[in-house]
Structure formats: C-alpha cells, structure tokens
Design a protein with these regions (language model features):
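Short linker/helix segments within small regulatory modules
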Residues: 158-165
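Short alpha-helix boundary/capping motifs
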Residues: 100, 116, 160, 175-176, ...
C-alpha cells in the first residue's frame, strides 16, 4: 500500500495520540495519562513536530485535544468503514478543514488540512482525520486496529502486506505472548 509521506506522519501521530490515553490494567488500576497536563501537551507537540502551534497552549487546548483523542479512539473501535467515515467526517468538519499546499521547515510539498491559525486540537483533527480518511477511501479501514494482547489494547495501523499484524510494537506484545505460549507448552510436555 503506497501511503504519501505526510499521511504516514499523520497516521503515526494519531496512533501516538490515541495511545497517550490511560489504560486499565488487569488489577483495575489505571495507568497515567500521557497527556495529563499542558506540559505533556507541549512535549507531544514537540515530539511530533506539529507546525503552526504557538507557545501559548493552555488548559482549554488540553481539554480540546483530549476530546479529539477520544473521538480518534472511537475510529479505531469502529466496526465498519461507514461508522469510521461518519466519525471522521464529524471530526474534520468541526475542525474547519481548509486544505492548502505547503513546504516548510525542510519538508517537501505536502498538504495541511487545518486552517491557518487553527488550534492544536483542530490541527490534529484536520490532518490526522484526513489521514484516517485516506485509509477508509483506500478500502483499508480494517488496518486501523487495537493490539490483541490481553493486557495492552494500544492502537496501531497494520501496514503489513497481508494485513496480518495482531500486536503493537510499543511493548513487543507479540513476543511476550509467543514466549508465554512456548513456556506453557514446554511445561505441559514436561508434566505429561
């Protein structure tokens, strides 16, 4: 699947954004929120090189980004392309999507979908929403997945050739489960 560079970056950003949400572990104790305060939001903006975001982010921006994050999480949970499309349409419409070609900061020509001067939440909703729209239009909505490891659930985009990826990369969940299954088989064989 050929994905333009700017779309790939936006897909990586939306996955990272969704994965900042706290998880419930098996003991019922929640993990920390990766966007728990404005400083964490600044760090996210810097890490993902989000352009056009000023230095005056505040609690209102944080609340708006958390709302957008929750909507993106719903896209990853959508049971079908129509449901995903409806969610994405709402996000990009609310963001006031305004496509424009740009080249900046050493990046070649690419499309920004957010309006000039848009808030960080609208920026994320527009650019990341359009990247998710690209996946739906390409008939690839099923590539927007959650990790199948019982104690994970992180979002990821399955870009494998045969759409077979089941686990995220962030915790090497697949390796952990394969090792656990191997050890269980060895233990069973030794007992039998």
């Amino acid at each position: 699947m050929l994905i333009p560079h700017d779309t790939r970056i936006a897909l990586d950003t939306v996955v990272d954004l969704v994965n900042t949400a706290p998880e419930e572990d098996s003991g019922g104790v929640g993990s920390t929120d990766g966007l728990g305060d404005v400083e964490a939001l600044y760090a996210f903006v810097r890490t993902h090189d989000i352009s056009g975001v000023g230095n005056d982010l505040g609690n209102r921006d944080l609340r708006a980004v958390l709302n957008v994050r929750a909507r993106f999480a719903e896209v990853f949970e959508a049971p079908d392309a129509r449901s995903a499309a409806d969610l994405i349409n709402q996000l990009v419409a609310a963001a006031g999507t305004t496509p424009q070609l740009t080249d900046h900061d050493g990046y070649d020509w690419h499309v920004h979908y957010f309006a000039p001067g848009a808030s960080v939440a609208d920026h994320l909703a527009a650019d990341c929403g359009m990247a998710l729209a690209f996946m739906v239009v390409a008939g690839e909505q099923e590539r927007l997945r959650r990790c199948e490891a019982p104690d994970c659930g992180h979002a990821f985009v399955d870009l494998s050739r045969n759409r077979s990826r089941r686990y995220c990369d962030s915790r090497t969940c697949g390796n952990r489960l394969h090792v656990a299954a191997y050890r269980a088989r060895r233990k069973e064989a030794a007992a039998g």
